[in-house]
Swiss-Prot record:
Protein keywords: Signal
A Pfam family per the record: Ins_allergen_rp
Signal sequence segment: 1-19
UniProt-listed InterPro entries: Ins_allergen
Transmembrane segments: none
Keyword Signal: yes
KW Signal (keyword) present: yes
Protein name, entry field: Protein G12
Upper classification of the organism: Eukaryota, Metazoa, Ecdysozoa, Arthropoda, Hexapoda
């Protein structure tokens, strides 16, 4: 289930735009994972919640607001985040282009490349937790888990990316949280909507081995 949650968290970045055909590379590994996902069903689910669920609608409005815009800018100013994006770009993954699809949709500042070198949820009650739980229920967890294990053995590019994530300087995220009022307000907003932020953080730390 943790693998499925991780794929949901990466879905926008890996499938927002199509990757150009190349020799076998990291983009092919991502395409293999995305190929397991019921994308049409997930899109229908997202649209249903956006059209009918007030909590999800309020969340979308928040993501389009000034406070989250500040969080977005602060997050992508972190050197560890810029380094990871640069790594993905050099591996042939259009990370900036994918993220800028999200930025354009939400009215956020577009990201520009620099030279600097995602779950167990509460019971379904609608709102954000309901959306996430239904999305996770659509995930072929066993197949995703098996593909993850296979990729770690067979794809040097995928293994290198995972090791890159394991070595990600996550302490910069903690420092950002402690220093940014906007980030703290965003966390409180998510918690007020019933999202167990602390648990999500623990899942990510466990998945990547962050201590």
């Amino acid at each position: 289930m943790k693998i499925a949650a991780f794929v949901v968290a990466c879905l926008v970045a890996t499938s927002a735009v199509s990757c150009a055909p190349t020799t076998r590379a990291l983009t092919d590994d991502f395409d293999d994972f995305v190929g397991l996902l019921p994308l049409n069903d997930l899109l229908d689910l997202a649209m249903r919640y956006l059209l009918t669920d007030k909590e999800v609608q309020q969340t979308l409005l928040y993501l389009q607001g000034e406070e989250f815009s500040a969080v977005w800018d602060q997050f992508f100013e972190l050197s560890a985040v810029r380094d990871l994006l640069q790594y993905l770009e050099e591996a042939g993954v259009p990370a900036y282009e994918s993220l800028n699809v999200v930025a354009d949709f939400l009215g956020l500042s577009p990201l520009k490349p620099t030279s600097v070198r995602s779950l167990s949820l509460a019971a379904r009650t609608g709102g954000l937790n309901g959306l996430l739980e239904e999305a996770l229920a659509m995930m072929p967890a066993a197949e995703l888990e098996a593909m993850f294990e296979e990729k770690m053995k067979s794809s040097t590019e995928f293994k290198a990316l995972f090791e890159k994530m394991q070595n990600f300087d996550h302490k910069q995220l903690r420092a950002l949280y402690e220093s940014s009022t906007e980030v703290q307000n965003m966390i409180h907003k998510l918690e007020s909507l019933g999202v167990d932020v602390d648990h999500i953080v623990e899942v990510l730390k466990d998945f990547f081995g962050w201590n």
